[in-house]
Swiss-Prot record:
It comes from the Eukaryota. Its EC number is 4.2.1.11. It comes from Xenopus laevis. This is Enolase 4. GO terms for cellular component: phosphopyruvate hydratase complex. Belongs to the enolase family. Residues 181-204 are annotated as: Disordered. InterPro entries: DD_ENO4, Enolase, Enolase-like_C_sf, Enolase-like_N, Enolase_C, Enolase_N.
Length: 572
């Protein structure tokens, strides 16, 4: 019996010894004794009030880097009340699973907003996006949020079969249903003023007008695609949160090999009026009238100036109203919707407002016009309807813009003055006005992914392209598009779509990417003003850090791909 007791005791002693040895080896491999000794010595020397807090901070630097543990998606509403998807990223941090951040981006449809079935389409896209996120969650599990480019490549690889499936599905639908053949507009004929040679007396000559290029088919939007862009942004935000650095600094480190010593805030293009197709008057040409501050102003000064001008415009509209204060109709772009019967009517209104508040157009502020020409084309007449009942050919539109800029030199930029298909007229317009104002392509430009695939930013020939973070666009693709545009001596603009979400990350993206301009809309909607507020916060941080810089001039780029283009001009 005593032998058995002795044997059990020896076995237990041996097990305890082996356990102690295993524990010692476990900690030795991880250098715990040395680091513990160092931590205790430094804590004693420093004598911090919060001893455990100091020890926690010391050991935190040796913890394993956070890794993604879960991706979740939920359906939310954007600023216009339309369904979209929010992406939430959770990470394993110091052995605990924690929710880190979320992001929402705009879901842009390939169909007009008024099209039937849009609500069902948006709901289907959001539901599909949520399912995609469930599929992506195990693929990203264990990856570090710092692996932005690797994760974006994984997302692009995941998305590519989806777009091929969507193309195949659409092809099958076309083959299964009768083809709807759109009538091709025939060349429009117009009577000449002179008599036709060799014809009977009094007969007028008939002039054949050039047919316009047909409308290009819109790029297919794959249901669920917002999951890709939103997840890419959420990963970038997670990396910045875990690294305890603002998102704009994180984006800047992705863009540059080293952090720049100075940050220049993008110049805001602020929408104040809308006189487009949806406005009550005859004028269709000005979907947005925007103000652009001169260089040298802070974002705060620019917004104060725009707000003062906007309030004065409201006073003027109320003063001429016969029924009391006019109802302030606000578009989804965040600006006032007014009617106009003449092309210069909204410009005259702004000019009068500037005089009342002591601003000089062309010196204290400039104007920009979003023409949205693709919305003005009447394909039956093969002409643009700049004013209701007034139709102009693409060549006549070029003459209209040249005359307008000559009479209104304070106009610094035109956005989408023509359809992207009217390449010859874009070239003519660039030759005529390229040294006087910026000509930007918004809807006339390619989506970011197609822009990178083709590496062609010369069609249409323009001063710059409005880049938007929507649908399947990843952060890496945004970085690539900015590099491409700047490499071709073009101006970079980061913009919001018409239906915008409440996420204010676009402000950080604009600063981190080094955008020359940022187009966020007007000041009259919450989802727009929140982005301006984020710009103000970033500007304040840069001011406190002493790293805020300023643009010195508005300089129009030299477009080498347009022959005989005049040299660049500069304005303050």
């Amino acid at each position: 019996m005593s032998y058995r007791v002795t044997g059990d005791a020896a076995r237990k002693a041996r097990e305890r010894y082996e356990l102690k040895q295993a524990a010692a080896e476990f900690y030795r491999k991880r250098n715990v004794p040395e680091r513990l000794e160092e931590a205790l010595n430094s804590t004693f020397c420093l004598g911090p009030e919060d001893v455990y807090g100091h020890l926690a901070n010391y050991f935190a630097q040796f913890s394993m880097p956070p890794t993604i543990c879960q991706i979740r998606g939920r359906k939310v509403l954007d600023g216009s009340g339309e369904p979209t998807v929010e992406v939430e990223v959770s990470c394993t941090v110091k052995n605990s699973d924690k929710r880190i951040c979320s992001s929402v981006i705009s879901a842009v449809s390939e169909h007009p907003k008024a099209s039937e079935g849009l609500e069902q389409e948006r709901n289907h896209s959001a539901d599909t996006a949520i399912q995609w996120l469930k599929d992506l969650s195990p693929l990203l599990k264990g990856m570090s949020p710092n692996e932005q480019h690797n994760i974006d490549q994984l997302l692009s690889d995941f998305y590519q079969p989806k777009i091929e499936e969507e193309k195949a599905r659409r092809q099958m639908e076309r083959e299964a249903s009768p083809m709807a053949i759109e009538p091709v507009p025939s060349p429009v004929t117009s009577p000449a003023l002179g008599k036709k040679k060799g014809s009977g007396k009094g007969k007028k000559a008939v002039v054949m007008e050039k047919p316009i290029p047909p409308k290009e088919a819109p790029e297919p939007v794959v249901p669920g695609s917002p999951a890709i862009g939103a997840l890419s942004l959420a990963v970038a935000k997670a990396s910045s949160v875990l690294g305890k650095t603002p998102l704009y600094l994180h984006i800047a480190t992705l863009r540059n090999e080293k952090l720049p010593s100075e940050f220049i805030m993008p110049t805001p293009m602020i929408s104040v009026l809308s006189c487009g197709k949806s406005s009550p008057g005859k004028l269709n040409l000005m979907k947005e009238v925007l103000v652009i501050p001169p260089t040298g102003l802070t974002v705060q000064q620019s917004l104060d100036m725009a707000l003062m001008l906007q309030n004065q415009i409201v006073k003027q509209i109320n003063s001429i109203s016969k029924t009391g204060p006019a109802i302030k109709n606000v578009t989804p772009l965040g600006c006032m919707l007014i009617g106009g019967d003449r092309i210069e009517q909204p410009l005259d209104l702004i000019c009068e407002a500037c005089q009342h508040v002591g601003l000089e157009l062309g010196r204290n502020l400039y104007l920009a016009i979003n023409c949205a020409a693709h919305e003005l084309m009447d394909y039956n007449k093969a002409k643009y309807e700049a004013l209701s009942g007034t139709f102009k050919s693409p060549d006549e539109m070029v003459d209209l813009y040249v005359d307008l800029i000559n009479r209104q030199p304070a106009i610094l930029a035109l956005l989408d003055p023509l359809r992207k298909e009217d390449a010859a007229q874009w070239e003519s317009l660039t030759k005529a006005l390229g040294s006087k104002c910026f000509l930007f392509a918004d809807a006339a430009s390619k989506p970011v992914c197609k822009l990178l695939e083709s590496a062609d930013i010369h069609n249409p020939p323009c001063s710059g392209t409005v880049i938007k973070h929507t649908n399947e666009t990843t952060v890496s693709q945004l970085l690539g598009s900015f590099k491409l545009i700047e490499g071709e001596n073009r101006v970079t603009i980061l913009g919001c779509p018409c239906e915008e979400s409440v996420d204010d990350s676009i402000a950080d993206l604009a600063v981190g990417l080094g955008a020359r301009f940022v187009k966020l809309g007007g000041l009259l909607r919450g989802e727009r003003s929140s982005k301006y507020n984020r710009l103000l916060a970033i500007e304040d941080e840069l001011t406190q850090a002493g790293t805020l810089g300023f643009w010195t001039k508005h300089e129009f780029p030299i477009l080498s791909d347009v022959e005989n283009l005049p040299g660049p001009e500069e304005v303050e």
